[in-house]
């Protein structure tokens, strides 16, 4: 649509000397693609993960409902008085700014590459003036534009709440830029990439095709309380493969490494009303980038090698939940840091929130956090995806995580914040609190909490086994507390020497019990078929099913797996052979 088509709507709005733009570019950068690591490895196991697909749960989830919502907001809009400041209250929260922007999204979308909410920027520095940031390809003086090409200096929303409009120049590449291949070399980076004896936030994790950064140690809130870690969806998931395994530091096809586990649940996009709890835009096709994946640690992974301490930062506090109704300065302008496997420890500033852009197909996308590196330094490099974005300590409190990185230098452009410096790199992140809620996870921030979480996982598994055996035999089965340590391996899935409590089971009953136990799973999620490492020693192999059919009078031995595993077929080396589990 031409700018002149909207002249009637804009003619009565105040003009800003900074509100100049190039209307030839009407699309914003799409999500960056991660360059894969070459791999010739094939997979012989099956696994399936639970993926959260974008859905809407508000009462008005259809296009008509969204239109009615904004139509009702229109009723609360006070009459405009061109050239004068509004008499209503100035916006002071993220919610205020997001509501004003959504209300005027049609105008803003027509003449910009994208928008965000935050404070006005002057000479590269943030002020304390609430504003909607409008990204344009080129800023020129309003003298060289016709009135229809100028954005208003102030926008007013429902109830008379108003804010400034700040135009920020965005150097648009038009296509994803070549991702920088440089890597910072330091003792910290060396440790994160495998030279340390521990693994934790910032450590390198890799699939067969990609590598990235471990974000946080987490646990499931429900079900069997699995302990694992969080990283990006695009780091951990490749739907061209039947399984989604993760290793540290490298997968077996590229070098030495330990099998960490396989993706149990993941999400990539969520509708705006589910993510924010409000309609963030008038476009019915509106989605938020929720790039996250949960990988529970494998059953035979040594949990003692996991640490909750963030290298280069230390102990961290609880997640900083971003409340849309909190004051802007609780987030915008705050100093942050991150620790990633490529660039190590870097610092930056939160410049904006809820970045909005539309692609060429007419779909509206949001990404939560926009960070610019300190002193015009890059905040992240390729491979840092998944890193925690951490608020630096303030007033003696511990640093608190607020997000995870999902994109950075591979974005399609850079921000020009000052006229005397060139464009700067920017990094986009996912709101950590909202991501954990969607994946039903809790972050683990102390080693003591980690041990407690592992114990809870063990108890949950014992309870599941006890319930399954009791339902099968019709007789309650109790497990003595002193036997718990004998039951579990590092994360506890192999069960040994369960007392019979004088239950006389026939061969048929034993077979039914074994079938019941083997298929124990939480029906809300698809079971994971790769709980164990691809290769295990014979001493760890489960006992055969015949032992269940012919139990001794002293004990009943059984094996529990979270989902059936397909037979494995491995290459045999000359001069050696492996007995494989069936």
Swiss-Prot record:
InterPro entries cross-referenced by the UniProt entry: Peptidase_S1_PA
Basic and acidic residues composition bias: residue spans: 562-572
Cellular localisation: Nucleus, Nucleoplasm; Cytoplasm
SUPFAM superfamilies in the record: Trypsin-like serine proteases (SSF50494)
Distribution of this protein across tissues and organs: Expressed in leaf sheaths, leaf blades, culms and panicles. Preferentially expressed in vascular tissues in leaves and culms.
Compositional bias per record (Low complexity), positions renumbered to this chain: 573-582
Recorded phenotype for the gene knockout or disruption: Narrow leaf phenotype. Reduced leaf blade width and plant height. Altered internode elongation pattern. Altered vascular patterns in leaves and culms.
Sequence segments annotated as region (Disordered): 1-26, 531-582
Biological process, per Gene Ontology: internode patterning; leaf vascular tissue pattern formation; regulation of leaf development; stem vascular tissue pattern formation
Annotated motif Nuclear localization signal, positions: 567-573
Cellular compartments per GO CC: cytoplasm; nucleoplasm
Biotechnology: Utilization of photosynthesis-related QTLs can enhance high-yield breeding and provide a new strategy for achieving increased rice productivity.
Function: Involved in the regulation of lateral leaf growth. May be involved in the regulation of basipetal polar auxin transport (PAT) and vascular patterning in leaves. Controls photosynthesis rate by regulating carboxylation efficiency and consequently photosynthesis rate. Controls panicle and spikelet numbers, and grain yield.
PANTHER family hit by this protein: EXPRESSED PROTEIN, PROTEIN NARROW LEAF 1
Protein name according to UniProt: Protein NARROW LEAF 1
Organism: Oryza sativa subsp. japonica (Rice)
């Amino acid at each position: 649509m031409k700018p002149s088509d909207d002249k009637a709507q804009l003619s009565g709005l105040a003009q800003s000397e900074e509100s100049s733009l190039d209307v030839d570019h009407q699309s914003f950068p799409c999500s960056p693609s991660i360059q894969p690591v070459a791999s010739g490895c094939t997979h012989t196991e099956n696994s399936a993960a639970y993926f959260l697909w974008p859905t809407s749960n508000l009462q008005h989830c259809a296009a008509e409902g969204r239109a009615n919502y904004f139509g009702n907001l229109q009723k609360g809009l006070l009459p405009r008085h061109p050239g004068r400041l509004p008499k209503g209250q100035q916006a002071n929260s993220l919610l205020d700014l997001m509501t004003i922007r959504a209300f005027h999204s049609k105008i803003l979308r027509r003449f910009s590459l994208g928008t965000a909410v935050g404070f006005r920027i002057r000479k590269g520095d943030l002020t304390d003036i609430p504003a909607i940031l409008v990204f344009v390809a080129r800023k020129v003086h309003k003298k060289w534009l016709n009135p229809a090409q100028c954005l208003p200096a102030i926008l007013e929303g429902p109830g008379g709440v108003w804010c400034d409009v700040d135009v920020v120049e965005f150097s648009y590449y038009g296509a994803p830029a070549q991702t920088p291949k440089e890597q910072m070399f330091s003792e910290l980076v060396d440790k994160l990439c495998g030279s340390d004896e521990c693994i934790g936030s910032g450590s390198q994790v890799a699939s067969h095709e990609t590598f990235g950064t471990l974000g946080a140690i987490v646990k499931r809130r429900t079900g069997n309380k699995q302990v694992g870690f969080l990283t990006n969806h695009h780091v951990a998931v490749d739907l061209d493969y039947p399984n989604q395994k993760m290793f540290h530091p490298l997968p077996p096809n590229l070098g030495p490494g330990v099998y960490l586990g396989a993706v149990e649940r993941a999400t990539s996009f969520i509708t705006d009303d589910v993510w924010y709890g409000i309609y963030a835009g008038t476009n019915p096709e509106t989605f938020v980038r929720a790039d996250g994946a949960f990988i529970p640690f494998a059953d035979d992974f040594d949990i003692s090698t996991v640490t909750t301490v963030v290298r280069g930062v230390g102990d961290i506090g609880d997640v900083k939940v971003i409340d849309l109704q909190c004051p802007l300065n609780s987030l915008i302008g705050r100093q942050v840091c991150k620790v990633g496997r490529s660039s190590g420890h870097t610092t930056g500033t939160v410049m904006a929130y809820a970045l909005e852009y539309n692609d060429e197909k007419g779909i509206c996308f949001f990404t939560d956090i926009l960070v610019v590196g300190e002193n015009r330094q890059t905040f992240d490099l390729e491979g840092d995806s998944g890193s925690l974005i951490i608020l630096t300590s303030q007033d003696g409190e511990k640093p608190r995580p607020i997000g995870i990185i999902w994109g950075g230098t591979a974005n399609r452009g850079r921000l020009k914040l000052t006229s005397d410096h060139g464009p700067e790199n920017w990094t986009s992140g996912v709101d950590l609190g909202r991501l954990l809620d969607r994946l039903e996870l809790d972050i683990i921030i102390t080693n003591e909490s980690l041990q407690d979480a592992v114990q809870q996982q063990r108890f949950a598994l014992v309870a599941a086994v006890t319930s399954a055996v009791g339902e099968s035999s019709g007789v309650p089965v109790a497990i003595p507390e002193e036997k718990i340590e004998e039951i579990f391996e590092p994360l506890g899935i192999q069960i040994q020497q369960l007392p019979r409590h004088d239950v006389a089971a026939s061969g048929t009953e034993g077979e039914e019990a074994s079938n019941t136990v083997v298929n124990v799973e939480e029906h809300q999620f698809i079971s994971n078929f790769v709980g164990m490492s691809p290769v295990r020693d014979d001493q760890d192999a489960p006992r055969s099913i015949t032992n269940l059919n012919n139990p001794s009078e002293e004990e009943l031995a059984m094996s529990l797996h979270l989902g059936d595993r397909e037979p494995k077929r491995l290459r045999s080396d000359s001069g050696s052979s492996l007995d494989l589990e069936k």
